[in-house]
Amino acid sequence: MTFHTLNELIADGVRGRYILVRSDLNVPLDGSEVTDDGRIKASLPVLTKLTDAGARVLVTAHLGRPKGAPEEKYSLKPAATRLAELAPFQVTLAGDTVGASAKEHAAALQDGEVLVLENVRFDARETSKDDAERGAFADELVSLTGENGAFVDDAFGAVHRKHASVYDVATRLPSYQGDLVHTEVEVLRKLTTETQRPYVVVLGGSKVSDKLAVIDNLIGKADTILVGGGMLFTFLAADGHKVAGSLLEEDQIPVVQDYLKRAADAGTEFVVPTDVVVAAKFAADADHETVRADAIEGSSFGAQGIGLDIGPESAAEFANRIKGAKTVFWNGPMGVFEFDAFAGGTRAIALALTEADAFTVVGGGDSAAAVRTLGFADDQFGHISTGGGASLEYLEGKELPGLSVLDR
């Protein structure tokens, strides 16, 4: 694929022009407080370049999964407030997306200023499966840019969505790839076509079903796949072990067994924990103990025990594998890192990545939130992706609509 770049757009001149920018402001909130502003900070460079060049910038973004109508808890107000605190330019939030407030504020926008339009998912047409409905919403967004507008997609976390603000606007305006999207694609390309070996992939998170396609595509490409998180218990069950009350997707056991066989034939090694931390219940203060992974029901909690983290022996083994790698991709926490008693595995993986002499990539979503929650800085890793689902779909080999539509 070949894309028009942000630098090309700026070289053509943007002063006084309305530039529609799809940003990723989908940040976690605690009430009205942003708890992780990583995506907001990642959006700043493109917005700053454009405002420095005199553009009038209209930002579209989503937050959460509202049901096609305004919901206060999904308002972009907290994200826009944090953006304004961080930005060297003026930021205003419209009271709607394409209504009277958006039109009034857009008309009043001055060179070098930013207007954040309210959550695009407050309009059901944004995510519609009907091309005409999405197109009509895209037309209304585009109309805010006037006669000489342009579109910049800088929301890598949304490029796997065929949504109006990602896909359809790009068919209606001269369109450019934002610097963040460019960086993300270049990083992921190194994980698929220019990979230095050994290549170690760390997969966690709760469900193996969420990772099936990426696992399928990594067999024969990755040298080693380290399995943690809730998904590890389906791997243990596939090997004939009982997992007590731990998360288990029984319908995926045959799939995992097939993967294990194929991986052995293809030269990819799956490494499953040899010990796990088992708790009496899912709670921060739950009684817990470490047991062998093949004897989970032998814990003090019997068949009611719940595995909530990989054990220290497994964490050390995973860390050694990571430190021996030249390329590492990590997606998904090893345990319930939000509870300190069950954060040990995730912390060990993060620390190993910071110490590895390797190109290290932390997948977006929970993994990015985990490293920041546990006190690690972004610059301790080679790259922290802003796109969880988008990163996985890229590694699955899928075509991403938000990228393909930018291909010139």
Curated annotation (Swiss-Prot):
Broad class of where this protein is predominantly found: cytoplasm
Annotated metabolic or biological route of this protein: Carbohydrate degradation; glycolysis; pyruvate from D-glyceraldehyde 3-phosphate: step 2/5
Protein EC: 2.7.2.3
A Pfam family of this chain: PGK
SUPFAM superfamilies per UniProt: Phosphoglycerate kinase
Alphabetical UniProt keywords: ATP-binding, Cytoplasm, Glycolysis, Kinase, Nucleotide-binding, Transferase
Subcellular localization, as worded in the UniProt entry: Cytoplasm
Chain positions recorded as ATP binding sites: 211, 307, 338, 364-367
Gene Ontology terms describing biological process: gluconeogenesis; glycolytic process
Entry's family note: Belongs to the phosphoglycerate kinase family.
Protein's name according to its UniProt entry: Phosphoglycerate kinase
